Amino acid sequence: MGSCAQGFMLGCCLLLAITWGPILSLVPRVQEEQQEWEETEELPSPLDPVTRPEETREKYSPRQGEDLPTSRCYRCCDPSTPVYQTIPPPQINITILKGEKGDRGDRGLQGKYGKIGSTGPRGHVGPKGQKGSIGAPGNHCKSQYAAFSVGRKKALHSNDYFQPVVFDTEFVNLYKHFNMFTGKFYCYVPGIYFFSLNVHTWNQKETYLHIMKNEEEVVILYAQVSDRSIMQSQSLMMELREEDEVWVRLFKGERENAIFSDEFDTYITFSGYLVKPASEP
């Protein structure tokens, strides 16, 4: 038997001796009191030598099948029933005799999911990652410039229909936004533009033209009939959207009108340029 087991048995014996010692010491005292009480019952009381009438009566005894009475009459000089003190049962403090630590148990089953908690505070900035690979090339951005200046060396007379003024001389045509075959400027960069038109009038004829935006008459260039020809001009600024068209139109022949030019000099010019792109704040 090991030293641990012997120590355990010795501790139990000491604990039982401490707990039951006072109880066992009371047993002889109780037996002596019981014996004295029995002797007093047998001997008559010296204080009352004469027998009382109540004692001569026959004591009550229940008949067969009859229960005992619920109460009984006692004399004041009769000895009372001995009262014994209730002692709690002994208890052993297990913590005094603590054993060795046991083995780790098996892992339990996973519990139910709890309620979703509130969003936590923003975390700290993480370390800088590695440099990524080069991406695919993007599309070319639109040029934020637009400008043109063209001229005409041939005279033009009105007829039964409206006529677009077509130009034959190209001074500036940045990115070819002005179409020399149709005589129209096409807007590729939205924004605010400036345009100007210069013509030479014809003697004894009216001069009647419009600067057009798509199919809308924006401004007129007009000169009355005169004995002498003069240079006449018109200019304006317009806000254009992408795919808008700007061109010059000669009025139809209800009223005879014309513009003058010759092959030696350029009398008719039309110019325009971008002032501010729409993408700029």
UniProtKB/Swiss-Prot annotation:
Domain spans labelled Collagen-like: 99-140
- Tell me the compartments it is located in: Secreted
For the C1q domain, which residue ranges apply? 141-281
Composition skew (Basic and acidic residues), residue ranges: 51-66
Instruction: Enumerate the residue ranges of region (Disordered).
Output: 35-68, 107-136
SMART domains documented for this protein: C1Q
List of glycosylated residues: 93
Pfam entry (one): Collagen
Q: What name has this protein been given in UniProt? A: Complement C1q tumor necrosis factor-related protein 1
Instruction: Please report the organism this UniProt entry assigns to the protein.
Output: Mus musculus
